[in-house]
């Protein structure tokens, strides 16, 4: 099994180009079911993208992939969809697989989707997905680990209030509503940039969507959607990760190819710690300015601080001056990186959904193991900060969400290699 070997202690200097957003391209790929042909560009080279490709092909889609140096171009033809079951063997690899549920159900009136997998962080229940689809007239049962859904005729427009903000359920609801009969109004929706990007793609396909980027989205269902091409937005989570990498290594890095508006909350949090962050053309420049102060953090739905950056921020706070309190409000069981950081000398105590982080002068290299995607990269950041060797095991998690990570870091001076 592959592992990463990191010799830390080298400030990162240079520039990093940000790849397409995984959390945008996956629902956009699922949206291809709603039309006959979808041409997607700026697609990141990730195993999760390959898994979604396999899933769509399993349903009968014909997919052509054109590989470029920094991205993929994917052309999806869904005119021959002929299978409506998303099998466990594919779905278990990635929880985003559940996003084929809404499109299959709204276009074909039936779908059978295995309960999803992905990172082992919390229950991530599908109750809200099911509730909103039922409100559109779907008949749904869970049997033998599968969501069995059907509808008599077209789904119907509905008014639905999400009990809590859910990115996944918001996406499934939008994907179902664009072909439903009548008007759907969704309240307490997720506002994440990736949801906005999906909506822009659907609008380009001919969907009628109002309130994009707000907590209330109104959708007037269409009989069909058009073929189109679409460029996926850049990945704010990848950008934030490299911003923290620059800070933790006391470096100076330009993060390029990202809209500042979608990473401003990350930039402001870094500035609060004493790191210098300057908006530049097409990105930001992050520079260590001689100090790193402890600050508290709470994860919340966008525009709050992303849960997908919590682990990386914790690595940074492990070396800060003072004590910080990190509160995880999105997922339970998302502190699995803490024992591994403590193996590297971090002083962290977990109390329920809170972690108390007391900054130490230096972390030390160790053999550590990744438990999930974001935890794995937090350990890489920790390893880059040390003056010794770190070995990271179970790095297959990384390939789900970070394209060319070793190359991008190495180009900025990091000593990191995969063996």
Swiss-Prot record:
The gene is murA. It comes from Rickettsia typhi (strain ATCC VR-144 / Wilmington). Keywords: Cell cycle, Cell division, Cell shape, Cell wall biogenesis/degradation, Cytoplasm, Peptidoglycan synthesis, Pyruvate, Transferase. Pfam families: EPSP_synthase. It catalyses: phosphoenolpyruvate + UDP-N-acetyl-alpha-D-glucosamine = UDP-N-acetyl-3-O-(1-carboxyvinyl)-alpha-D-glucosamine + phosphate. InterPro entries: Enolpyruvate_Tfrase_dom (IPR001986), Enolpyruvate_Tfrase_sf (IPR036968), MurA_subfamily (IPR050068), RNA3'P_cycl/enolpyr_Trfase_a/b (IPR013792), UDP_GlcNAc_COvinyl_MurA (IPR005750). Pathway: Cell wall biogenesis; peptidoglycan biosynthesis. It comes from the Bacteria. It is found in: Cytoplasm. Phosphoenolpyruvate binds at residues 22-23. GO terms for biological process: cell division; cell wall organization; peptidoglycan biosynthetic process; regulation of cell shape; UDP-N-acetylgalactosamine biosynthetic process. Its EC number is 2.5.1.7. The keyword Ribonucleoprotein does not apply. This is UDP-N-acetylglucosamine 1-carboxyvinyltransferase. The keyword Protein biosynthesis does not apply. GO terms for molecular function: UDP-N-acetylglucosamine 1-carboxyvinyltransferase activity. Cell wall formation. Adds enolpyruvyl to UDP-N-acetylglucosamine. UDP-N-acetyl-alpha-D-glucosamine binds at residues 95, 164-167, 308, 330. Belongs to the EPSP synthase family. MurA subfamily. One of its GO terms (cellular component) is cytoplasm. The modification 2-(S-cysteinyl)pyruvic acid O-phosphothioketal is found at residue 119. The active site is at 119 (proton donor).
